[in-house]
Amino acid sequence: MEHTVQIEELVVELSLDWLLGEVRIHHHDHPYLIIRQTTNQVFPKRYLLHHQVKGGRLVIQDRRKRIFSLGLHLYQTDLTIYLPKNQIQSMSIRCKGANLQAEGLRVENVYGHLTSGKTMLSGEIKHLLLETVGGLISSRQLAAQTLSLHATSSKGELMGAFSDVDLHVTGRRIQIHSTSMLHSLKSISTGAYVKVAIPENDGFTCYVKKRSGAFRNDFSCHREKENMVHKDGKRSFEVDIRGGHFLLSHQH
């Protein structure tokens, strides 16, 4: 069964709140926005998505939330959203147990709150803020000026071109591979393995605060007080390790 909604109004902000299933977000060549929900035959119509457009903001909600308390989350459904190009400026996505695929995005701001499930991102996002609990998160060919990642008990591998990176990692393993030199890096990790890979560069100053755990660095550095300085030392890195491992690696 397929439920399709076509939205002609101008939408600059998208807010999505969704549970289980596959969620895909893409751009298409049309000036309108399309929401397509596919379900099995037994899916009750009263639980089809709810949407509302107000002042350029589109809200899409999963109506199955109401029945979750009864444990009736057997109704399988997938969601695909087709966005017009050069229109959406910001997106807020909350997914619980869903597999999110948002590819080729061209937006200013993306906020994602992702609980379990898998997430794959690509495209150009100026400011990207991700919070993930128990999730698996990855990206390819992703360009982000600011990348802020709060990860708890999650695995992640983000590949792309990043400038300002802010990490808060608790448990499991997070890897960041940047094809461009970072402008700044802040990392607080607790009982986690964190790897940040950057290309050869003109220099950085890295302040390492280590309560327990291990710090490893692939770049040749000299010490200035509590700082490790590579070449001209211009870029500022701060690494706080509260157990686990942190590796600053050479991106070949």
For each feature predicted by the language model, list its residue ranges:
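Intrinsically disordered, low-complexity terminal regions
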Residues: M1-H252
